Amino acid sequence: MEIAAGYLSPYFITDPARREAKLEGPCFLIVQGKLASARQMLRVLEQVANSGRSLLVVAEEVEGEALATLIVNKIRGSLSCCAVKAAGAKEERDAVIRDLVTVTGAKMVSDEEVASLALDDLGGADRAVVTVNRTQVLGAARLN
């Protein structure tokens, strides 16, 4: 599956020569709405980091503390992660998010529900490759 949206910061790049963020066996945090508070995500980040998996965050907006926390965790090597803004008009964006939920087996949640997610709610795939303007999700849903 391919999404016409790319990484929100070049700090997520793992392959500088190709300007790509490559995530192996990623979990997916799919948020319908804006993700701005780091506090919302702490439990999810801890669970993913402890599992040894990577994390791809897809939301209508990822900003402020939430984006900064993801970047810091990536730079420190605590968590392999990337954030992508679900772009497009509302109907198009909602359709892309629904398709992503189907492909990955992840649960779509509102920003208020993020703190209550378990690792099992994050679905998965074999691999994700993110560039400045596109995201590819490769492989079928992989549940833990």
Question: Over which residues does each language-model region extend?
Answer:
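Long, structured protein-protein interaction/assembly regions in large complexes
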Residues: 1-144
